[in-house]
Amino acid sequence: MCLIEMQDVWKTYPNGTVALQGIDVHIKGGEFVYVVGPSGAGKSTFIKLMYREEKPTKGEIVINGSHISRLKERYIPHMRRKIGVVFQDFKLLPKLTIYENVAFAMEVIEASKKEIKPRVMEVLELVRLKHKARSLPDQLSGGEQQRVAIARAIVNNPDLIIADEPTGNLDPETSMDIMETLLDINKRGTTVIMATHNKEIVNNVRKRVIAIEAGRIARDEQKGEYGYED
């Protein structure tokens, strides 16, 4: 089943910069896809279009049967409930505990307290941080904070995880730990799309690679290589 379809997608910013042009992509449910390319090639725009942080200038984007490029603003929060996003800089709430950070994602969709506690503890166990539930973010390492961000992204059982440079601020060992967590989530059936500059991970853990150069798709390969010297 096709989870994501992009058909002739273009993005031009108000200053005239053409970030993406003529993008055609089909991603099946359950895939793990790397998005690679030089800095400024359009990777971030490509990723942001999928959760409607950006809107295409032209073209169609369909995710799980929903034409998100046509969605009215009031429907976007509901659409995003089916998508988990993991950022490079974690974006945790500093004054909330780890448990509270993850629970907040469920509170936003008005889940009951009866539902929240067992589910939050379940995902914290999945990312191996159940023992840190009462800790604050600044008491955790960078890798641990990113695992909390992943727990928050998956707590509402999304169909899709979008990870934008999730290992960008981490050392090689911690980066591989984060990668293993994302692979585990993918094995459970969740589609994962990961924008990255991490050559070692892409070349050592072979998955589908979509390479973007100058706003266009330059390569789309199964078990592809990174292909750049950063």
Predicted regions and their residues:
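Short coil-to-helix segment of the ABC ATPase nucleotide-binding domain corresponding to the Q-loop/switch region
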Residues: 96-104
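Catalytic Walker B motif of ABC-type/P-loop ATPase nucleotide-binding domains
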Residues: 161-164
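Helix-to-loop junction immediately C-terminal to a conserved catalytic motif
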Residues: 51
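Conserved catalytic motifs of ABC-family nucleotide-binding domains
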Residues: 157
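Conserved ABC transporter NBD signature motif
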Residues: 59-67
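Conserved ABC ATPase signature
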Residues: 135-140, 144
